[in-house]
């Protein structure tokens, strides 16, 4: 048994039932919950993010929910710092951090650390945004391929946020994002919990999903329809009423929100909005599965099984995470 304190990751695609299982675990284990979800960090974005209800959050508090205004950004590096702080506080009380959510980049940031990148430069960013508007994202992607082919291969040509950030890093520092990461990795080998170090916990990685992908697709479609019935469009309408929010913000680009925003902009019909929202959520689930297939030592659970709690406890006992 490792001398490191234990932590549990409960991962899985959207609409798989992660929150329900996490709450069941807190009833039988000395765990406290930490949300790992890039949409749940935002206040006022409740319906479209499938945020647990106020009643559930009151009975089963989750850290890192409602910690940012939608006008603000929230990076993987910020998540790592916040999560490490929360995990340390939970561990100090003799309890186990139970991290639950589907933002796989956040989990990776915790496990592998992140390279220290140059701070954002407003002037450089404004110049790049102007270029994107005037010349198109394809031109920015071409520029990135010239100075950082590794990042260009990794970043989709239609991803303005990451394209601009990668070019910004190069223009501010004169060094590519790939070079920064490679140097940071070399310097951080053997480190513990620093920005590039490894996570100082013994982690049990769990993932929950239906074994039949068709069932997950049905659940995604049903949940999106339920969100619309619960007032998702009105929620986005309220966000649009704020003068400081726009479609380019990370919060508004969240799956579902950008489709409803486009609908309210008149770019989509109601049926198109519904269809594209469901498709985008399916694509998110596919990306989450891709991450999870490469995740080391993950223990899978079937969303439809009636004994997931006992299966989880048996697994945790078998790997001595609870010793």
Swiss-Prot record:
It is an enzyme of class 2 (transferase). Disulfide bonds: none annotated. Pfam families: IPPT. The record marks 103, 125 as: Interaction with substrate tRNA. Its EC number is 2.5.1.75. Keywords: ATP-binding, Magnesium, Nucleotide-binding, Transferase, tRNA processing. ATP binds at residues 12-19. It catalyses: adenosine(37) in tRNA + dimethylallyl diphosphate = N(6)-dimethylallyladenosine(37) in tRNA + diphosphate. InterPro entries: Dimethylallyltransferase, IPT, P-loop_NTPase. GO terms for biological process: tRNA modification. Its cofactor is Mg(2+). Substrate binds at residues 14-19. Residues 37-40, 161-165 are annotated as: Interaction with substrate tRNA. Signal peptide: none annotated. GO terms for molecular function: ATP binding; tRNA dimethylallyltransferase activity. It comes from the Bacteria. Belongs to the IPP transferase family. Catalyzes the transfer of a dimethylallyl group onto the adenine at position 37 in tRNAs that read codons beginning with uridine, leading to the formation of N6-(dimethylallyl)adenosine (i(6)A). Monomer. This is tRNA dimethylallyltransferase.
């Amino acid at each position: 048994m490792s001398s490191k304190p234990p932590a549990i990751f409960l991962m899985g695609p959207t609409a798989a039932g992660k929150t329900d299982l996490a709450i069941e675990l807190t009833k039988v284990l000395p765990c406290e919950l930490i949300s790992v979800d890039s949409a749940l960090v935002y206040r006022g974005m409740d319906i479209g993010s499938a945020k647990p209800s106020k009643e559930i959050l009151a009975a089963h508090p989750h850290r890192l929910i409602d910690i940012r205004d939608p006008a603000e950004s929230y990076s993987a590096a910020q998540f790592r710092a916040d999560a490490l702080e929360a995990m340390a506080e939970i561990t100090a009380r003799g309890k186990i951090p139970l991290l639950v959510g589907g933002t796989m980049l956040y989990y990776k940031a915790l496990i592998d650390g992140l390279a220290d990148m140059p701070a954002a430069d407003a002037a450089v960013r404004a110049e790049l945004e102007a270029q994107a508007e005037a010349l198109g994202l394809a031109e920015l992607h071409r520029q990135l391929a010239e100075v950082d082919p590794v990042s260009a291969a990794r970043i989709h040509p239609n991803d303005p946020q990451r394209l601009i950030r990668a070019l910004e890093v190069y223009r501010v520092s004169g060094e590519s994002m790939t070079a920064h990461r490679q140097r940071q990795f070399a310097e951080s080998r053997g480190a513990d919990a620093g920005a590039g170090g490894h996570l100082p916990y013994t982690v049990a990685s769990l993932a929950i999903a239906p074994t039949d992908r068709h069932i997950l697709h049905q659940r995604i479609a049903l949940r999106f329809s339920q969100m619309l019935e619960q007032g998702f469009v009105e929620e986005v309408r309220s966000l649009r009423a704020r003068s400081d929010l726009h479609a380019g913000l990370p919060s508004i680009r969240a799956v579902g929100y950008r489709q409803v925003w486009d609908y309210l902009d008149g770019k989509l019909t109601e049926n198109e909005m519904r269809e594209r929202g469901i498709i985008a959520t399916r694509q998110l689930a596919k990306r989450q599965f891709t991450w999870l297939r490469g995740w080391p030592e993950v223990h899978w659970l079937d969303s439809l099984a009636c004994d997931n709690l006992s299966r989880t406890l048996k697994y945790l006992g078998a790997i001595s995470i609870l010793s």
